[in-house]
Amino acid sequence: MRGCLQLARWLSAAPKGTAASLTRAPFVLANAPRYFTSSASRAGSRSTATKPLSDLEKRISAIPIERYRNFCIVAHVDHGKSTLSDRLLELTGTIEPGSNKQVLDKLDVERERGITVKAQTCSMIYNHNGEDYLLHLVDTPGHVDFRAEVSRSYASCGGALLLVDASQGIQAQTVANFYLAFAQGLELIPVINKVDLPSAEPERALEQMKNSFELDTENAVMVSAKTGLNVEKLLPTVIEKIPAYGHFPVDSHELLPLLTLSSPIGDCKKPLRMLLVDSWYDSYKGVICLVRIFDGEIRAGQQVVSFATGLKYYVGEAGIMYPNETPQSVLRAGQVGYIYFNPGMKRSKEAKIGDTFTRVGFEKAVEPLPGFEEPKAMVFVAAYPVDADHFEHLEDSINQLVLNDRSITVQKESSEALGAGFRLGFLGTLHCSVFEDRLRQEHGASIIITPPSVPVKIIWKDGKEEIITSPAKFPEDEELRSKVAEIQEPYVLATLTFPEEYLGKVIELCEANRGEQKSLEYFTPTQVILKYELPLAQLVDDFFGKLKGSTKGYASLDYEESAWQTGNIVKLQLLVNKAPVDAVARIVHSSQVERLGRQWVTKFKEHVDRQLFEVVIQAAVGKKIIARETVKPYRKDVLAKLHASDVSRRRKLLEKQKEGRKRLRAVGNVVIEHKAFQAFLAK
């Protein structure tokens, strides 16, 4: 009431016309979510009224598609991709120079770890020879676990800066990223970074690039992303070397070189054809989609339809990343930008990466784009809320993060020990670790994560094959003997690069992890490239940490899927008073059973409280006990009230206590707190 009186007094004192204009204007809450607006406000958002163009939008609208350049930066981890991106953004005036540090590393986990885990995009305007060019930059991850991000990024690009550290030279993921870019037909520009370091050897790095990749290094650019040395030479090279045409995204079934055209892909006069490249969740706007416009144009208020789901949406806002979300009145063919819908998507699963959108009514006139190849999850963990009441919160948090990372697989799972949870699939152990950090940092989720495991293939005697990702689905002993022909495990081809002096230690490590050597070559007199075929199960068991320890941190690792091979695979279980603890079971190779079994019983004993009866902790494979520990019971002194009684009376009381403990052990339930599992499963 007081607020109404104040508003009335203000209106009476305001100049003429103010009150009338205020009463005519619709009243909209400033903080109301845009995707839950009323029908009246939605109708207003679809009106054809246009706002005055900003100076930025006027410059962009004047640039023809022939002067668009889409490119990315690819390199090994820590070779300076994000720092170089900062310098390019400063050079084009997109951000203010000075205090910028990894502007495109927007996640907390990226800034903490100092690595890029999520491909980020940004549009820039650069004047070259008196003409404006619209440049679209993608900063890609370097680690092998995020290769799906890199592969999707290439679909938006016509070329790439191949970045190599002058002091380290070519590393394992430099090789992997080169071949991925080469296979997709990208124009590659060699760039040597960190030339200002005392240990820099740019000539050696150039020689490596020339010999390993057969690249023309005469026009390579020597830069220091940290100081900005020679960075101004990069963008003219990008404009001159990278073509204005782009690529269609990779076919969903075959990784073939992408279709390259002699003229720019994209025609503003054709019906809209828009590719969904990425998506993320905003608590205010809902699902935000990163899109590439192949044909036509898109504006706020227009209605579009998805080819994948058939669902229709009104566009609430369209814009570019500059480097943050910057609204524009229109996105045209050749541009990469963002959109969100009003009302928003009701379920996060509606945003399917690789989906094609067009204007409603033009479905038959537009051919959908092929989409992306779906990555296969190869590392699995189970995730449970610490408090069972927080299950729904954990489910919402996982769904929002999966919206931003579609390479993760999610299945609901239940455990007698830990309750309802999820089985999550990842591309690697770092991928899993980053997801766990994001759950805790961005959503405040308190979770219990089981150790990573890999899938196994069961070949039944009737000829059927089945992929098993959960220990709960692994066949029991009797079924193994009678119905299973063989069990196979996945192998990978690992590429390791390191100084020659550590060759003996690295070979010893690989052999100890059931590896088989495939090749050994020197790409310089002091640098070795070693290829080994390794079981994926050994790779996820902290193999990279052991490799770093053996080489004092100088080794790098990359790997790719190889084949399934027959192995002696078993299910290792933890038993507490002969009852299996399902949350701790793992599928392992028989060579790991004794080591893991002893570790389990020793560690689990530390976290089990004493009971009134004896608690027996065992590690077992089938009916065979591998290791055992015992938690002694509380001891009640039944002889305390006896003084000088006879020996037979004492013996009778002790025998009675012994019988009582046997009955307790037979019928009593061992109480194991959630915190015990949390401590046991902690790394």
UniProtKB/Swiss-Prot annotation:
Keywords: GTP-binding, Hydrolase, Membrane, Mitochondrion, Mitochondrion inner membrane, Nucleotide-binding, Protein biosynthesis, Transit peptide
Coiled-coil positions: none
Subcellular location: Mitochondrion inner membrane
Highest taxon, organism lineage: Eukaryota
Molecular function GO labels: GTP binding; GTPase activity; mitochondrial ribosome binding
UniProt keyword Membrane, yes or no: yes
GO biological process, alphabetically ordered: positive regulation of translation; translation
Gene3D superfamilies documented for this protein: 3.30.70.240, Elongation factor 4, C-terminal domain, Elongation Factor G (Translational Gtpase), domain 3, P-loop containing nucleotide triphosphate hydrolases, Translation factors
Binding residue positions for GTP: 75-82, 139-143, 193-196
Catalytic activity, reaction form: GTP + H2O = GDP + phosphate + H(+)
Main localisation: mitochondrion
Gene Ontology, cellular component aspect: mitochondrial inner membrane; mitochondrial matrix
SUPFAM superfamilies to which the protein is assigned, alphabetical: EF-G C-terminal domain-like, P-loop containing nucleoside triphosphate hydrolases, Translation proteins
Keyword Membrane: yes
Domain named tr-type G: residues: 66-250
EC number: 3.6.5.-
Membrane topology according to the record: Peripheral membrane protein
Transit peptide start-stop: 1-43
Alphabetical list of InterPro entries matching this protein: EF-4, EFG_III/V, EFG_V-like, G_TR_CS, LepA_C_sf, LepA_CTD, LepA_IV, P-loop_NTPase
Function: Promotes mitochondrial protein synthesis. May act as a fidelity factor of the translation reaction, by catalyzing a one-codon backward translocation of tRNAs on improperly translocated ribosomes. Binds to mitochondrial ribosomes in a GTP-dependent manner.
NCBIfam families the record matches: lepA (TIGR01393), small_GTP (TIGR00231)
Family, similarity comment: Belongs to the TRAFAC class translation factor GTPase superfamily. Classic translation factor GTPase family. LepA subfamily.
Name the record gives this protein: Translation factor guf1, mitochondrial
Organism of provenance: Aspergillus fumigatus (strain CBS 144.89 / FGSC A1163 / CEA10)
Gene from which the chain derives: guf1
